[in-house]
Amino acid sequence: MESNIILVVILGISIVGKATSVAISVAALLILKLLGLDKYIFPYLNDKGMFWGLVLLTAAILIPIAQGNVKAIDIKNNLVSFVGITALVLSFLTTYLSGVGLRYLTVQGHSDVMPSLILGSVAAAAFLGGVPVGPLITSGILALLVKMVKKS
């Protein structure tokens, strides 16, 4: 019951904060719980959900290439530009941070910080016009900061 209340609070905040993807996700989880399907679907989502979410996100990002809107010459020209090189470096960094964050949340068992990560993402979406896709990167930064503080 407590988990339902927490999810409803996150749902309300995400609706007010106009974080539609978070609201849909929370609503889907609540519906699955209310229908009693959580015991069947949650284990699969817990195990494979992140992978399939990343597959869909990556596929969506690659659509312009698949549609032929991006040519090989465009990629070549971009890769040698300041923006292209910066994109490569930042992509390398954020991908690394996402991996650190995923391990921090799952393997290291710090999933209790997820509500704070979600609320921060929702607040940024509401007040700064952001898109709430950064909890893994945020948790990666958090994991590195926690590690540095513990060493001090």
Swiss-Prot record:
It is a multi-pass membrane protein. InterPro entries: UPF0756_TM (IPR007382). Keywords: Cell membrane, Membrane, Transmembrane, Transmembrane helix. The keyword Repeat does not apply. It comes from the Bacteria. Pfam families: DUF441. The chain crosses the membrane at residues 5-25, 50-70, 82-102, 117-137. It is found in: Cell membrane. GO terms for cellular component: plasma membrane. Its main location: membrane. PANTHER family: UPF0756 MEMBRANE PROTEIN YEAL. Belongs to the UPF0756 family. This is UPF0756 membrane protein CA_C0092. It comes from Clostridium acetobutylicum (strain ATCC 824 / DSM 792 / JCM 1419 / IAM 19013 / LMG 5710 / NBRC 13948 / NRRL B-527 / VKM B-1787 / 2291 / W). The lineage of its organism: Bacteria, Bacillati, Bacillota, Clostridia, Eubacteriales.
